[in-house]
């Protein structure tokens, strides 16, 4: 799904680094997969993959399964990790993350 945008080896390393429950930190993950240095267009493509229901927003249920976009066997985020992730990205407080909010969070 991320071919041409992100390297498989970077994704594998990033997933390995957050295997333990409670260890996911979005900023570290974005850096490890190489997303921080990508263009706005590439970040938008990644957002489109994570936005499973194509609502133009990433909601809490999609964030919970965030890692599974990168590997089907990856774990779901814990409720605490999901809440922290949502709070970090939801700058306007509407309970979901839009593409501009996602891009701002990636660039951190």
Swiss-Prot record:
Ca(2+) 2 binds at residues 90, 92, 94, 96, 101. It holds the Pfam family EF-hand_7. PROSITE patterns: EF_HAND_1, EF_HAND_2. The modification N-acetylalanine is found at residue 1. Ca(2+) 1 binds at residues 51, 53, 55, 57, 59, 62. GO terms for molecular function: calcium ion binding. Residues 38-73, 77-108 form the EF-hand domain. GO terms for cellular component: cytoplasm. Keywords: Acetylation, Allergen, Calcium, Metal-binding, Muscle protein, Repeat. In muscle, parvalbumin is thought to be involved in relaxation after contraction. It binds two calcium ions. PANTHER family: PARVALBUMIN, PARVALBUMIN ALPHA. Is regarded as an important allergen. Belongs to the parvalbumin family. This is Parvalbumin beta 2. The lineage of its organism: Eukaryota, Metazoa, Chordata, Craniata, Vertebrata.
